[in-house]
């Protein structure tokens, strides 16, 4: 006797391995000779980088190398937007900031050491001098006349305007009985998956092969985008998504760390690991929502809807990654 596929309670098969601690997450991946990366991040939302002094950090125990955006800018490329709509204003997005930071948590320096603790200790010794610039917090303020401009290539702090138009809304208004309007404020949120993001990279200099373990929802797209950003041949990149401890959509992107780690592994000819702390994740992992939507529903007293006028402002942050509305 067989069990019907529909309308029956099917026993899950994946749970025992995970709830008994036999899963394999990025943090569980350990390779011989592996180094650890800690990133120095901007405490300011908008600032010019005046100087970076890593002399004391380089003397710290266990430190193997320290990289700035200036050091790696030719190799790191620019992070792309995963999906662009017509007339999107794409701006350069360096994985390690060069000259200017544009959000709290923007990565500025990568410290590489024999252990995470040693890299963290050394990172605390890196001295970055900033010149703080004006900021905007609310979307209405960002669009106001005279607002500080985050990117020269995106005037009025607007990445794109996407219009979908079918029929005449003015005709619907004039020929209908009633119109109801409402503003909806969809608050910003932080996904906070159980497993923080993490990356392990092994580079084989003999074959030029990059193998990456990363906590992601899109391993195939990560490979495509990584090849695009770094110029490394796609057929020489292998991306492995091991067990992923949640995401809520926050692991649908190519992140800066997924570009920084393979470039450092290639430079040092040793495996590297980066795993974010929980507090770091609040700064460096994408947030969600943060929309303001004004809706007008036009219709007749018999319940027929004759028109719908929807205008949405979406806070995309400092850079586009994957447009979602």
Residue spans for each PLM region:
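Glycine-rich and small/hydrophobic secondary-structure elements
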Residues: 88-118, 249-301
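Flexible, low-hydrophobicity surface segments
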Residues: 1-155, 179-182, 267
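Gly/Pro-rich active-site capping loops and adjacent beta-alpha segments
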Residues: 2-3, 74, 91, 118-138, ...
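Alpha-helical support elements that line or immediately flank enzyme active sites
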Residues: 39-70, 109-129, 199-268, 314
